[in-house]
């Protein structure tokens, strides 16, 4: 996922510097971000044109073990950062959000962590994780741990304070 974050950061920087746009919808091309849900992002952006929209996962298509590990990842992230991050790359970003993202160093390491950090004016729409077009996911347990640490690293000051409080209490 860090590779994905870097690719998205590169694309956002390019689009911001070279193209005229109102919104950008980053998404995976492997089938897990369902193209038919783009229409919901567009409808939502018409209702709230100044807000960034995130696709909140309401259903996943992976095996039970991965779902369990992913749940554990979300809990760890919440405990250490104070943020419940229930979205990935599949978002509809306003131009002002894209500008904030390209100016945030953490964007190159964790897309969802950086977006949570820089954009308070966002709302979510439900998103069902689609079936992959080709082959199984390469997200192993160790990759999921690295993904968690990437998100947590965005909020290092919060993590330090929370860790100190956990030790004291």
Residue map of PLM features:
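Active-site-proximal cofactor/substrate-binding loop regions of enzyme domains
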Residues: 29
């Amino acid at each position: 996922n860090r590779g994905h974050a870097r690719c998205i950061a590169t694309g956002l920087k390019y689009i911001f510097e070279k193209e005229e746009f109102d919104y950008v919808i980053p998404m995976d091309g492997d089938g897990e971000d369902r193209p038919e849900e783009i229409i919901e992002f567009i409808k939502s952006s018409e209702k709230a044109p100044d807000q960034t929209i995130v696709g909140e996962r309401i259903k996943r298509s992976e095996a039970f073990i991965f779902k369990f590990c992913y749940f554990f990842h979300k809990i760890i992230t919440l405990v250490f950062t104070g943020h419940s991050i229930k979205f990935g790359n599949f978002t509809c970003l306003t131009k002002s959000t894209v500008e904030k993202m390209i100016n945030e160093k953490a964007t190159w390491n964790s897309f969802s962590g950086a977006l949570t950090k820089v954009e308070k004016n966002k709302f979510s729409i439900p998103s069902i994780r689609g079936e992959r077009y080709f082959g199984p996911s390469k997200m192993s347990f160790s990759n999921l741990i690295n993904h968690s640490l990437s998100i947590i690293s965005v909020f290092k000051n919060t993590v330090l304070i929370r860790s100190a409080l956990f030790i004291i209490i």
